[in-house]
Design a protein with these regions (language model features):
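Mature-chain termini and adjacent capping regions
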Residues: 1-180
């Protein structure tokens, strides 16, 4: 959530900008950061509307995948993964991963959960993600598979304090034995 209003910083081997269309194309070893979000791809097209909202379309080299990583709000946890194509929408604060999508949830540095599908949509505002195993005809993705997930239970914590038993303590000004 905190990343939503952060600036988008991009490095690449080459850049082409069309001011008329408000379209910027980055090619070659693209590295984008936006707050704690990191995206690495071969190519990225950023379209900006007149309100400043950005849509970034990322693609990998043939046979390769894009890498992404983002810290989860208020936790020592990260979402990371790989995919062939991705679209980041700054207005909706969503990241859509399409074709051979894999999402890993890390607790600290340990992979806790792993989710795979043809399309994964992450909503950073609501912290909800949806996974689909079917190919998306709109993106030209081929093939279909079942969604696969490995989910690790969270460590148990004491959510409530133990209930007090016995006689409550009373304040005293004396220390020691009160017996005669």
């Amino acid at each position: 959530k905190a990343d939503r209003d952060k600036p988008m910083n991009i490095e690449a081997d080459a850049l082409k900008h069309d001011d008329q269309k408000q379209l910027t194309i980055f090619n070659g070893k693209v590295h984008m950061t936006k707050g704690t979000m990191v995206l690495k791809a071969a190519r990225m097209e950023v379209q900006q509307d007149n309100k400043g909202h950005q849509i970034a379309k990322l693609s990998a080299e043939p046979g390769e995948r894009i890498f992404f990583r983002q810290k989860r709000e208020g936790l020592d946890e990260y979402s990371e993964g790989e995919v062939e194509t991705a679209v980041y929408n700054s207005q909706e604060d969503t990241l859509t991963l399409t074709t051979r999508a894999e999402l890993r949830l890390l607790r600290g540095t340990v992979v806790a959960d792993r989710i795979q599908g043809q399309q994964i949509v992450l909503n950073n505002t609501t912290e909800v993600f949806m996974v689909d195993g079917k190919a998306n005809a709109a993106t030209g993705a081929s093939g279909s598979q079942r969604v696969r997930a490995t989910l690790t239970p969270r460590a148990k914590t004491n959510e409530t304090a133990p209930t007090a038993t016995g006689t409550p303590l009373k304040p005293s000004q004396r220390i020691g034995n009160d017996k005669p």
